[in-house]
């Protein structure tokens, strides 16, 4: 009798906020940092629950998914999906011992999904660095030759890969080489994704990794930044707060299989 009541009533105990040590997050096959993120489960029966992902999906700070519940041997599983803009978010998770383990995927259906050749030449890359801060704006002449030498002098092609799983990737082929090199493994491990928010293409970085990235930037170019009177805080002002992520907004112009990325046309400074 007791067993019957506990097994049929346990679903009511699922309804709570799972965060910190009570939640595990995996995007596809990659473990995601949980700081600043949470999963809220609200079970309405032993078969149904709503699952809310907070600060987990770049497209929206809070994504609610209607999920089907099943119980076996004290473990509840939940599955469901929801569409946010042009992104289909799917979850498949378990709750056992008060811990929610959530595996989720993003599947982008946008027309920008694909492998794009970066259009070579002066118009290929633009940066939104007309900030009104003269120290940042004065960096443009320094950046132009640096990026020009880095990219076009040493590679024969640059591709921006925008796969449907939402992981941002760039690959390039060094002159004389027969194979491409890329940053896909790094962007996957560091959860560097892309999304479309309010029609704007954004490259997004998990806030938990921004500290690491800014530290590396400080180590690599801190003296140059300091000499120019620029702080990491000034750079951060160029980013958009997307909840669990920071986004760098860019416009994307497609011409056949080639693409050009640029900032708001009113604020464009060609970098190359």
Where are these regions (language model features)?
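Buried hydrophobic residues that stabilize the cores of well-folded domains
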Residues: 56, 71, 115-118, 141-145, ...
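Beta-sheet ligand-binding and adhesion/scaffold domains
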Residues: 73-112, 120-122, 200-272
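N-terminal glycine/threonine-rich, aromatic-flanked beta-hairpin/loop signature
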Residues: 23, 30-66, 127-245
